[in-house]
Amino acid sequence: MKSDAVTKGIQQAPHRSLFNALGLTKEELDKPLIGIVSSYNEIVPGHMNLDKIVEAVKLGVAMAGGTPIVFPAIAVCDGIAMGHIGMKYSLVTRDLIADSTEAMAMAHSFDALVMVPNCDKNVPGLLMAAARVNIPTIFVSGGPMLAGRVHGEKRSLSSMFEAVGAHAAGKMTEEEVEEFENKVCPTCGSCSGMYTANSMNCLTEALGMGLKGNGTIPAVYSERIRLAKHAGMKIMELLQNNIRPRDIMSEKAFLNALAVDMALGCSTNSMLHLPAIAHEAGVDLNVDIANEISAKTPNLCHLAPAGHTYMEDLNEAGGVYAVMNELDKKGLLYTDLITCTGKTIKENIEGCVNRDPDTIRPIENPYSQTGGIAVLKGNLAPDSGVVKRSAVAPEMMVHVGPARVFDCEEDAIDAIKSGKIVAGDVVVIRYEGPKGGPGMREMLNPTSAIAGMGLGSSVALITDGRFSGASRGASIGHVSPEAAVGGNIALIEEGDIIKIDIPNNSLNFVVSDEELERRRVNWSPREPKITTGYLARYTAMVTSGNRGAILEVPRVK
């Protein structure tokens, strides 16, 4: 066993003395050491129940003959970090989580790992670590929040952000906003729509790294405690059979995940995280392939914010496996791949029927014949831009309008809320990319302000930043190259005509080559906004959004 390096032999007597200090017995040290990565904390609603999940995992590991040992991972609540400097520190934690988990796993010679994440950057960060360390690993998340109820209708956090915009437009009173505030987030768990956290937990299941129900069983259900116990037991099987993350997360597994992504209508953040996870697994996953998969993969779900169904509804309908079963009817998945169950995808999804065709459309009757996400290209986004097509109003799928240009999120929000943005405009928010932000902030506040003020079907927003999974509308993010490195988005001027054509995957602005070159000559890079601490190091190492904003050591010239 890998842990023999710290538990066996006379040379390891000092190591054993330290295990003795932990209260571990010789009998426990004779068993495999299973690291349980706990993301529990008291600041993230999606993580406040993870202590209970961890205890259940420990019981499962012990029942199956292992010795569970818990160590922590950090996690940020994107909702609490939203709209201020805190959002610069969200995406960057993905890589901190991957790095620190790698360090803990390698330093202590664990035989296997059980990852217990839940929210936005925590899930991909731990998937990246799993691929890097490549010892037997399984995931069990904390589960989604139940939807709130306001006046008898299901609501979620995206409704809350839009209520603030509606108040600014004079469409809601402060008392009505307060009612939303008190009711939209009724339980612990990851926010209740198909936002980033739930997207990544569902895609963990699709990749084969989580058991059935990992992405959809609500946080407050006792079924999730049982799932955690099963995950603890299952890791011992994976260890015995030496099934490792890179055996599971193959190139075909990532193509499966993209297909499920398109069917579910996941957050556009998946287009950042899947390439980054694939990179750690030794797989080159170019975002361009998303359009190829989208062209043949129907969109089957319109969960919030795209529609009025929620994660609890998806769970009742049969969950991720039911969606995969629908896709398999048209041969859209590779089903012979091994998963963390020790079985193939085909074996896993057999008999997992769609129990609610209103939540999961049958593949013969999809919301659209194409997937939920589109990658756009053109002179505005030479490398790529990403949009959640399933959350765009039909009248905005093709749009032409004047650019309203802002060099930071705050200036754009002020303009939107003060009524300076009108129907037909295209809001451009730049210098918010991975380097320029730094940290590629989510533009949920401006998109929610646009929707709340009744402009969601007439105003588009384009940014080199990114969007919360709770954003809806013609919200095009991840524009690459970003403004900070001289991408064309830096050269747009107020009033330039922008042409958006989502069905044809194009994003352009009307400018001659000569004029574009003139503007480029006059452009110069800006000084970094932050020059100390982790964000300064991140700025120096982070790559473009179209590459998943992975980190690379700068080459010495």
From Swiss-Prot:
Which residues are recorded as binding Mg(2+)?
A: D78, D120, K121, E442
Q: Which InterPro entries does the UniProt record give?
A: Dihydro-acid_dehy_C (IPR042096), DihydroxyA_deHydtase (IPR004404), DiOHA_6PGluconate_deHydtase_CS (IPR020558), ILV_EDD_C (IPR056740), ILV_EDD_N (IPR000581), IlvD/EDD_N (IPR037237)
Carrying N6-carboxylysine, the residues are: K121
Known pathway? Amino-acid biosynthesis; L-isoleucine biosynthesis; L-isoleucine from 2-oxobutanoate: step 3/4; Amino-acid biosynthesis; L-valine biosynthesis; L-valine from pyruvate: step 3/4
Which residues bind [2Fe-2S] cluster per the record? C119, C191
The UniProt keywords, alphabetically, are: 2Fe-2S, Amino-acid biosynthesis, Branched-chain amino acid biosynthesis, Iron, Iron-sulfur, Lyase, Magnesium, Metal-binding
Q: Which GO terms describe its cellular component?
A: cytosol
Keyword ATP-binding in annotation? no
Q: What cofactor does this chain's UniProt record say it requires?
A: [2Fe-2S] cluster; Mg(2+)
Catalytic residue positions: S468 (proton acceptor)
Query: So what does this thing catalyse?
Result: (2R)-2,3-dihydroxy-3-methylbutanoate = 3-methyl-2-oxobutanoate + H2O; (2R,3R)-2,3-dihydroxy-3-methylpentanoate = (S)-3-methyl-2-oxopentanoate + H2O
Q: Name the GO terms of the biological process aspect.
A: isoleucine biosynthetic process; L-valine biosynthetic process
PROSITE patterns found in the cross-reference section = ILVD_EDD_1 (PS00886), ILVD_EDD_2 (PS00887)
Q: Which Pfam families match?
A: ILV_EDD_C, ILVD_EDD_N
Record's cofactor remark: Binds 1 [2Fe-2S] cluster per subunit. This cluster acts as a Lewis acid cofactor.
| Oligomer and partners | Homodimer.
Name under which the protein is recorded: Dihydroxy-acid dehydratase
Q: Which organism is it from?
A: Lachnoclostridium phytofermentans (strain ATCC 700394 / DSM 18823 / ISDg) (Clostridium phytofermentans)
